[in-house]
Amino acid sequence: MTKIFADSSINPLSVAPMMDHTDRHFRYFLRQLTRHTLLYTEMITAQAILHGDRQRLLNFSPEEKPVALQLGGDDPQLLAECARIGQDWGYDEINLNVGCPSDRVQSGNFGACLMAQPDLVAQCVSAMQKAVEIPVTVKHRIGIDHRDSYEDLVHFVEIVANAGCQRFTVHARKAWLQGLSPKENRTIPPLRYEDVYQLKKDFPQLLIEINGGITQTEQIQQHLSHVDAVMVGRAAYENPYLFATVDRDIYHKTNLVPSRAEIIERMLPYVEERLRHGDRLNQITRHLLSLFNGQPRAKFWRRTLSDSTLLASAGPELLQTALQAQKFPGVLVA
Protein backbone atom coordinates (compact mmCIF):
# COMPACT_ATOMS: atom_id res chain seq x y z
CA MET A 1 0.00 0.00 0.00
CA THR A 2 1.50 3.33 -1.04
CA LYS A 3 1.85 5.91 1.71
CA ILE A 4 0.06 9.22 1.22
CA PHE A 5 1.70 12.39 2.52
CA ALA A 6 0.84 16.07 2.45
CA ASP A 7 3.71 18.42 3.30
CA SER A 8 7.02 18.67 1.51
CA SER A 9 9.06 17.11 4.31
CA ILE A 10 7.41 13.73 3.76
CA ASN A 11 6.30 13.95 0.14
CA PRO A 12 6.66 10.44 -1.34
CA LEU A 13 7.83 11.55 -4.79
CA SER A 14 10.17 14.22 -6.11
CA VAL A 15 12.08 15.22 -9.23
CA ALA A 16 15.81 15.57 -8.69
CA PRO A 17 17.66 18.87 -8.98
CA MET A 18 19.51 18.74 -12.31
CA MET A 19 21.87 21.38 -13.63
CA ASP A 20 20.73 22.94 -16.92
CA HIS A 21 17.43 21.10 -16.61
CA THR A 22 15.24 21.89 -13.61
CA ASP A 23 14.87 25.63 -14.16
CA ARG A 24 11.58 27.44 -13.65
CA HIS A 25 10.33 26.66 -17.17
CA PHE A 26 10.83 22.92 -16.79
CA ARG A 27 9.20 22.98 -13.36
CA TYR A 28 6.16 24.82 -14.71
CA PHE A 29 5.92 22.33 -17.56
CA LEU A 30 6.17 19.36 -15.22
CA ARG A 31 3.52 20.87 -12.98
CA GLN A 32 1.09 20.50 -15.88
CA LEU A 33 1.58 16.74 -15.56
CA THR A 34 1.61 16.37 -11.77
CA ARG A 35 0.18 18.71 -9.16
CA HIS A 36 1.72 17.04 -6.13
CA THR A 37 5.27 15.86 -6.89
CA LEU A 38 7.93 17.86 -5.04
CA LEU A 39 10.09 19.77 -7.53
CA TYR A 40 13.61 21.13 -7.04
CA THR A 41 15.61 24.00 -8.42
CA GLU A 42 18.94 23.43 -10.03
CA MET A 43 21.74 23.64 -7.48
CA ILE A 44 22.46 27.31 -6.75
CA THR A 45 25.64 28.20 -4.90
CA ALA A 46 25.54 30.33 -1.79
CA GLN A 47 27.86 32.84 -3.40
CA ALA A 48 25.58 33.20 -6.41
CA ILE A 49 22.58 33.96 -4.21
CA LEU A 50 24.44 36.41 -2.01
CA HIS A 51 26.18 38.27 -4.82
CA GLY A 52 24.23 37.46 -7.99
CA ASP A 53 20.92 38.33 -9.63
CA ARG A 54 18.41 36.89 -7.17
CA GLN A 55 15.43 37.68 -9.34
CA ARG A 56 16.86 35.58 -12.15
CA LEU A 57 18.11 32.81 -9.87
CA LEU A 58 15.20 32.45 -7.46
CA ASN A 59 11.99 33.69 -9.05
CA PHE A 60 9.36 31.07 -9.75
CA SER A 61 5.66 30.90 -10.55
CA PRO A 62 3.24 30.10 -7.70
CA GLU A 63 1.95 27.18 -9.77
CA GLU A 64 5.31 25.42 -9.36
CA LYS A 65 4.79 24.77 -5.64
CA PRO A 66 5.68 22.66 -3.78
CA VAL A 67 9.25 23.52 -4.80
CA ALA A 68 12.54 23.11 -2.93
CA LEU A 69 15.67 25.23 -3.23
CA GLN A 70 18.91 23.26 -3.48
CA LEU A 71 21.99 25.06 -2.19
CA GLY A 72 25.66 24.41 -2.80
CA GLY A 73 28.21 25.56 -0.25
CA ASP A 74 30.26 24.70 2.82
CA ASP A 75 30.04 27.80 5.01
CA PRO A 76 27.36 27.38 7.71
CA GLN A 77 26.68 31.10 8.14
CA LEU A 78 26.49 31.84 4.42
CA LEU A 79 24.19 28.87 3.90
CA ALA A 80 22.02 30.03 6.80
CA GLU A 81 21.65 33.44 5.17
CA CYS A 82 20.75 31.79 1.85
CA ALA A 83 18.23 29.56 3.59
CA ARG A 84 16.56 32.66 5.07
CA ILE A 85 16.45 34.25 1.64
CA GLY A 86 14.97 31.06 0.16
CA GLN A 87 12.30 30.89 2.84
CA ASP A 88 11.39 34.55 2.33
CA TRP A 89 11.23 33.89 -1.43
CA GLY A 90 8.53 31.29 -0.81
CA TYR A 91 10.36 27.98 -1.17
CA ASP A 92 8.95 24.99 0.69
CA GLU A 93 12.24 23.30 1.57
CA ILE A 94 15.97 23.98 1.65
CA ASN A 95 18.21 21.15 0.44
CA LEU A 96 21.98 20.89 0.77
CA ASN A 97 23.87 19.30 -2.13
CA VAL A 98 26.26 16.64 -0.83
CA GLY A 99 26.08 14.51 -3.96
CA CYS A 100 27.52 16.32 -6.99
CA PRO A 101 31.01 15.00 -7.86
CA SER A 102 32.04 17.52 -10.53
CA ASP A 103 35.52 19.03 -10.41
CA ARG A 104 34.08 22.55 -10.39
CA VAL A 105 31.93 21.79 -7.37
CA GLN A 106 34.78 20.04 -5.57
CA SER A 107 37.01 23.07 -6.11
CA GLY A 108 34.57 25.00 -3.91
CA ASN A 109 34.60 22.24 -1.27
CA PHE A 110 30.95 21.35 -1.63
CA GLY A 111 28.91 18.61 -3.24
CA ALA A 112 29.92 14.96 -2.83
CA CYS A 113 33.32 15.72 -1.31
CA LEU A 114 31.50 16.89 1.82
CA MET A 115 30.66 13.26 2.59
CA ALA A 116 34.23 13.07 3.92
CA GLN A 117 33.37 15.93 6.30
CA PRO A 118 30.16 14.90 8.08
CA ASP A 119 30.83 17.23 11.01
CA LEU A 120 30.92 20.21 8.64
CA VAL A 121 27.71 19.05 6.97
CA ALA A 122 26.14 18.81 10.42
CA GLN A 123 27.23 22.37 11.19
CA CYS A 124 25.72 23.58 7.91
CA VAL A 125 22.43 21.81 8.58
CA SER A 126 22.26 23.11 12.14
CA ALA A 127 22.89 26.70 11.06
CA MET A 128 20.26 26.53 8.33
CA GLN A 129 17.69 24.96 10.62
CA LYS A 130 18.16 27.74 13.15
CA ALA A 131 17.59 30.28 10.40
CA VAL A 132 14.34 28.92 8.93
CA GLU A 133 11.10 27.20 9.83
CA ILE A 134 10.80 25.14 6.64
CA PRO A 135 12.46 21.69 6.33
CA VAL A 136 16.22 21.51 5.79
CA THR A 137 17.22 18.31 4.00
CA VAL A 138 20.35 16.70 2.56
CA LYS A 139 20.91 14.93 -0.77
CA HIS A 140 23.99 12.73 -0.80
CA ARG A 141 25.63 9.65 -2.27
CA ILE A 142 25.90 6.22 -0.74
CA GLY A 143 29.61 6.90 -0.37
CA ILE A 144 32.67 8.36 -2.09
CA ASP A 145 35.87 6.77 -3.36
CA HIS A 146 36.93 4.13 -0.83
CA ARG A 147 34.67 5.54 1.88
CA ASP A 148 31.77 3.53 0.53
CA SER A 149 31.03 0.81 3.06
CA TYR A 150 27.61 0.64 4.67
CA GLU A 151 29.30 1.56 7.94
CA ASP A 152 30.63 4.75 6.31
CA LEU A 153 27.11 5.61 5.17
CA VAL A 154 25.69 5.04 8.65
CA HIS A 155 28.43 7.18 10.18
CA PHE A 156 27.59 10.09 7.87
CA VAL A 157 23.83 9.88 8.37
CA GLU A 158 24.12 9.49 12.13
CA ILE A 159 26.22 12.64 12.55
CA VAL A 160 24.04 14.76 10.26
CA ALA A 161 20.83 13.43 11.82
CA ASN A 162 22.11 14.35 15.27
CA ALA A 163 22.33 17.93 14.00
CA GLY A 164 18.60 17.85 13.30
CA CYS A 165 18.25 16.69 9.69
CA GLN A 166 15.21 14.45 9.34
CA ARG A 167 15.06 13.79 5.59
CA PHE A 168 17.90 12.24 3.60
CA THR A 169 17.79 11.72 -0.15
CA VAL A 170 20.27 8.96 -0.94
CA HIS A 171 21.59 8.47 -4.46
CA ALA A 172 22.16 4.71 -4.33
CA ARG A 173 25.54 4.91 -6.06
CA LYS A 174 28.93 5.87 -4.73
CA ALA A 175 30.77 8.71 -6.42
CA TRP A 176 34.34 8.63 -7.62
CA LEU A 177 35.75 12.11 -7.02
CA GLN A 178 38.56 11.54 -9.53
CA GLY A 179 38.60 9.63 -12.81
CA LEU A 180 34.89 9.75 -13.70
CA SER A 181 32.86 12.59 -15.15
CA PRO A 182 29.57 13.59 -13.50
CA LYS A 183 27.75 11.75 -16.30
CA GLU A 184 29.81 8.60 -15.73
CA ASN A 185 29.19 8.88 -12.00
CA ARG A 186 25.47 8.59 -12.75
CA THR A 187 25.87 5.28 -14.56
CA ILE A 188 29.13 3.42 -13.88
CA PRO A 189 29.11 2.89 -10.10
CA PRO A 190 26.63 0.07 -9.42
CA LEU A 191 23.30 0.75 -7.76
CA ARG A 192 23.04 -0.47 -4.17
CA TYR A 193 19.37 -0.17 -3.34
CA GLU A 194 19.63 -2.66 -0.48
CA ASP A 195 21.91 -0.31 1.43
CA VAL A 196 19.26 2.41 1.28
CA TYR A 197 16.58 -0.04 2.39
CA GLN A 198 18.77 -1.07 5.31
CA LEU A 199 19.32 2.57 6.21
CA LYS A 200 15.56 2.97 6.66
CA LYS A 201 15.49 -0.12 8.88
CA ASP A 202 18.35 1.17 11.01
CA PHE A 203 16.96 4.72 11.21
CA PRO A 204 13.17 4.23 11.27
CA GLN A 205 12.70 7.69 12.79
CA LEU A 206 14.23 9.36 9.72
CA LEU A 207 12.64 10.02 6.34
CA ILE A 208 14.71 8.15 3.77
CA GLU A 209 14.31 8.88 0.07
CA ILE A 210 15.93 6.75 -2.63
CA ASN A 211 17.36 8.03 -5.92
CA GLY A 212 19.16 6.48 -8.87
CA GLY A 213 18.15 4.50 -11.96
CA ILE A 214 14.40 4.84 -11.43
CA THR A 215 12.49 5.12 -14.70
CA GLN A 216 9.02 3.59 -14.25
CA THR A 217 5.98 4.03 -12.01
CA GLU A 218 6.19 0.37 -11.05
CA GLN A 219 9.71 0.93 -9.73
CA ILE A 220 8.52 3.91 -7.70
CA GLN A 221 5.80 1.81 -6.11
CA GLN A 222 8.21 -1.02 -5.38
CA HIS A 223 10.71 1.29 -3.67
CA LEU A 224 7.94 2.85 -1.57
CA SER A 225 7.45 -0.51 0.11
CA HIS A 226 10.95 -0.12 1.58
CA VAL A 227 11.55 3.62 2.02
CA ASP A 228 9.57 6.80 2.60
CA ALA A 229 10.06 8.49 -0.75
CA VAL A 230 11.48 8.21 -4.24
CA MET A 231 13.37 10.82 -6.25
CA VAL A 232 13.37 10.47 -10.05
CA GLY A 233 16.21 12.08 -11.98
CA ARG A 234 17.02 11.84 -15.68
CA ALA A 235 13.86 9.89 -16.54
CA ALA A 236 11.82 12.97 -15.63
CA TYR A 237 13.60 14.88 -18.37
CA GLU A 238 13.95 12.11 -20.93
CA ASN A 239 10.38 10.86 -20.54
CA PRO A 240 8.37 13.55 -18.73
CA TYR A 241 5.01 11.99 -19.59
CA LEU A 242 5.91 9.37 -16.99
CA PHE A 243 4.56 11.91 -14.49
CA ALA A 244 1.13 12.23 -16.11
CA THR A 245 -0.14 9.28 -14.06
CA VAL A 246 1.64 9.71 -10.72
CA ASP A 247 -1.06 11.85 -9.11
CA ARG A 248 -3.42 8.93 -9.68
CA ASP A 249 -1.04 6.03 -9.07
CA ILE A 250 1.15 7.40 -6.25
CA TYR A 251 -0.99 10.07 -4.58
CA HIS A 252 -4.33 8.35 -5.28
CA LYS A 253 -5.95 11.53 -6.55
CA THR A 254 -8.94 11.43 -8.86
CA ASN A 255 -7.84 14.13 -11.32
CA LEU A 256 -7.87 12.99 -14.92
CA VAL A 257 -4.65 12.04 -16.69
CA PRO A 258 -3.91 14.85 -19.18
CA SER A 259 -3.17 14.06 -22.79
CA ARG A 260 -0.02 15.42 -24.37
CA ALA A 261 -2.08 17.83 -26.45
CA GLU A 262 -3.81 19.11 -23.30
CA ILE A 263 -0.43 19.72 -21.70
CA ILE A 264 0.65 21.83 -24.67
CA GLU A 265 -2.58 23.83 -24.51
CA ARG A 266 -1.96 24.48 -20.81
CA MET A 267 1.53 25.76 -21.60
CA LEU A 268 0.44 28.37 -24.15
CA PRO A 269 -0.62 31.12 -21.69
CA TYR A 270 2.61 30.63 -19.76
CA VAL A 271 4.68 30.87 -22.93
CA GLU A 272 2.91 34.08 -23.90
CA GLU A 273 3.52 35.56 -20.45
CA ARG A 274 7.21 34.65 -20.36
CA LEU A 275 7.79 36.05 -23.84
CA ARG A 276 6.29 39.33 -22.66
CA HIS A 277 8.86 39.28 -19.84
CA GLY A 278 11.70 38.95 -22.35
CA ASP A 279 12.39 35.21 -22.23
CA ARG A 280 13.20 33.45 -25.50
CA LEU A 281 10.90 30.74 -26.77
CA ASN A 282 13.64 28.12 -26.99
CA GLN A 283 14.41 28.62 -23.28
CA ILE A 284 11.00 27.06 -22.65
CA THR A 285 10.48 24.68 -25.54
CA ARG A 286 13.82 22.90 -25.07
CA HIS A 287 12.23 21.27 -22.02
CA LEU A 288 9.32 19.96 -24.09
CA LEU A 289 11.34 18.08 -26.70
CA SER A 290 10.84 14.68 -25.03
CA LEU A 291 7.11 15.01 -24.34
CA PHE A 292 6.33 12.58 -27.18
CA ASN A 293 9.19 10.23 -26.35
CA GLY A 294 8.35 6.74 -27.59
CA GLN A 295 5.32 7.88 -29.57
CA PRO A 296 4.84 7.53 -33.33
CA ARG A 297 6.22 10.49 -35.29
CA ALA A 298 7.84 11.97 -32.19
CA LYS A 299 10.73 13.10 -34.38
CA PHE A 300 8.44 15.60 -36.13
CA TRP A 301 7.71 17.22 -32.79
CA ARG A 302 11.38 17.45 -31.87
CA ARG A 303 12.42 18.62 -35.32
CA THR A 304 9.87 21.41 -35.45
CA LEU A 305 10.82 22.80 -32.05
CA SER A 306 14.55 22.34 -32.57
CA ASP A 307 14.66 23.83 -36.05
CA SER A 308 12.37 26.78 -35.49
CA THR A 309 12.66 28.08 -31.96
CA LEU A 310 15.92 29.88 -32.67
CA LEU A 311 14.07 32.19 -35.07
CA ALA A 312 13.62 35.64 -33.57
CA SER A 313 10.02 35.79 -34.78
CA ALA A 314 8.95 32.47 -33.22
CA GLY A 315 5.98 32.69 -30.85
CA PRO A 316 3.60 30.40 -28.93
CA GLU A 317 1.89 29.35 -32.15
CA LEU A 318 4.97 27.26 -32.93
CA LEU A 319 3.88 24.78 -30.27
CA GLN A 320 0.57 24.31 -32.03
CA THR A 321 2.35 23.95 -35.36
CA ALA A 322 4.64 21.31 -33.87
CA LEU A 323 1.67 19.49 -32.38
CA GLN A 324 -0.03 19.39 -35.77
CA ALA A 325 3.19 18.18 -37.37
CA GLN A 326 3.38 15.37 -34.85
CA LYS A 327 -0.14 14.30 -35.79
CA PHE A 328 0.06 15.07 -39.50
CA PRO A 329 3.69 15.16 -40.61
CA GLY A 330 2.85 16.40 -44.09
CA VAL A 331 1.74 19.85 -42.95
CA LEU A 332 5.20 21.35 -42.53
CA VAL A 333 6.74 23.41 -45.28
CA ALA A 334 10.29 22.29 -46.00
UniProtKB/Swiss-Prot annotation:
Catalytic activity: 5,6-dihydrouridine(20) in tRNA + NADP(+) = uridine(20) in tRNA + NADPH + H(+); 5,6-dihydrouridine(20) in tRNA + NAD(+) = uridine(20) in tRNA + NADH + H(+); 5,6-dihydrouridine(20a) in tRNA + NADP(+) = uridine(20a) in tRNA + NADPH + H(+); 5,6-dihydrouridine(20a) in tRNA + NAD(+) = uridine(20a) in tRNA + NADH + H(+)
Keywords, sorted A to Z: Flavoprotein, FMN, NADP, Oxidoreductase, RNA-binding, tRNA processing, tRNA-binding
Gene (UniProt): dus2
Source species, domain of life: Bacteria
Known role: Catalyzes the synthesis of 5,6-dihydrouridine (D), a modified base found in the D-loop of most tRNAs, via the reduction of the C5-C6 double bond in target uridines. Specifically modifies U20 and U20a in tRNAs.
Lineage of origin: Bacteria, Bacillati, Cyanobacteriota, Cyanophyceae, Synechococcales
Organism field: Synechocystis sp. (strain ATCC 27184 / PCC 6803 / Kazusa)
PANTHER family: FMN-LINKED OXIDOREDUCTASES SUPERFAMILY PROTEIN
Cofactor: FMN
The protein, known as: tRNA-dihydrouridine(20/20a) synthase
